[in-house]
Design a protein with these regions (language model features):
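Basic/aromatic-rich interaction segments and small domains that mediate binding to polyanionic partners
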Residues: 2-77
């Protein structure tokens, strides 16, 4: 996983009783959350090793998301 990689949101990997129908990107500017639908593509802008998260651009939004709920798209076919 590195900046520039295309990733897909995987809500199923979140260990919750009622997984949300959207991944929430944390917007540090407004301290709010932006929706990112399960299965939609995004691109890693920067990795954040301290929090085990990534800054991702997805669905027209940019925010932080846990690396646990994203999966790199294998472009090799």
């Amino acid at each position: 996983m590195k900046p520039g990689d295309l990733v897909i949101a995987r809500a199923a990997k979140v260990k919750r009783r009622n997984p949300p129908n959207a991944i929430m990107l944390y917007d540090w500017k407004t301290t709010g959350y932006l929706p990112w639908k399960n299965g939609n593509l995004g691109m890693i802008i920067e990795l954040d090793p301290k929090t085990e998260g990534a800054i991702v651009m997805a669905d027209g939004n940019v925010g932080w998301v846990s690396q646990v709920i994203i999966e790199v798209i294998d472009e090799s076919g």
